[in-house]
Amino acid sequence: MTDEGRIYGRNPVLELLRSGGRRADEIAVLAGARGPLAEVVALARRAGVKVSFRTREQLTAIAGTDRHQGVVARVASAEYADLSGLLEIPKRRGEAPFFLALDQVQDPRNFGALLRTAEAFGAHGVIVPKHHQVGLTEAAARAAMGAVEYIAVARETNLVSALETLKKSGVWIYGSAVGEGSPAWTVDLTGPLCLVLGSEGEGLRPLVARTCDILLTIPMAGQVGSLNVGAAGAALCYEVARQRALGGKTA
C-alpha cells in the first residue's frame, strides 16, 4: 500500500502476502532465493501471484534503491480509508475506539514507525492531514515493516474538522504536549479516544492543540527535554494498551 505501487524488503512483502488484503500484481525475487525469500516465493505461488526471478541489479532498478533485500512487489496504488470507515472498525469489533492522529509528520521513517506502533498496540486506525504530511510512500511502508497491510489510514483535508467529527461520535481527543498537561499514566485512557501527535519540529499546531480535550505529557527523568515523535507515540500507545489490558488502572 504505497503511493508508487511498489513495496520492497522481506518483511513488508511477507506481510503483504500473509494479510490476504491487497493483491500483488507481481513479485520479483532475487534468483537463487533461500530462507525468507523462499517463503515469499511459496506464499506468492499459493496466492496465484506471478513470480519472476531477477538479478540484484535488476531489482535495484525496479525498486529504485539497493535496499530491497532481494524482493520487490508491484501492487495497486494506495487506497486511503475515509473517516466514517475508521469509526466502523471498533464498532464491528465491539471495542472502545482507539485512533492515532498525526499533525504534519513529515519524516517517512517516523510515519512508518508510528504505523507499526499503532497496529502493534491495537489502534483501530490512523488519521493524517492531506497537506504537509508524508503519505504512504515506499520509505514509509518499509519503515512500517508490513504494518501498512493491517491498519487503516484516513487522509483528511482538515485535521481539526476530522477531530471535531470524532468528538461528535463520542471520542475524546488527547494531545501530546511537552511541559504542559497531565502525565499520561495518571489519566484514564480506557474510553473512546484519539491520540494526537505533532510534527517533528513544531509539535502540535496551536489550533490542533486547542481542539484537544486533554493534553498529555510523558515525564522525563533524564537531561533531555523531549522525545522524538516516534518514541513519544510508542510510549503513549503502550500506555493506552497497558491500561486497557489492566481494566483501566492508572499509575
Predicted region positions:
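N-terminal positively charged helical leader segments and presequences
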Residues: 1-89
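Short, glycine/polar-rich helix-capping loops at beta-to-alpha or helix-loop-helix junctions
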Residues: 36, 133-139, 202-211
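Short beta->alpha connector loops at strand-helix junctions that form conserved
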Residues: 55, 76, 103, 129-130, ...
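Short basic, glycine-rich beta-strand/loop surfaces that mediate nucleic-acid
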Residues: 62-76, 144-147, 152-154, 190-198
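Active-site/ligand-binding-proximal alpha/beta "capping" segment
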Residues: 174-228
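Structured adenosyl-cofactor binding patch, chiefly the S-adenosyl-L-methionine
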Residues: 14, 120, 142-147, 206-251
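RNA substrate-binding interface of SAM-dependent RNA methyltransferases
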Residues: 15-18, 22, 88-182
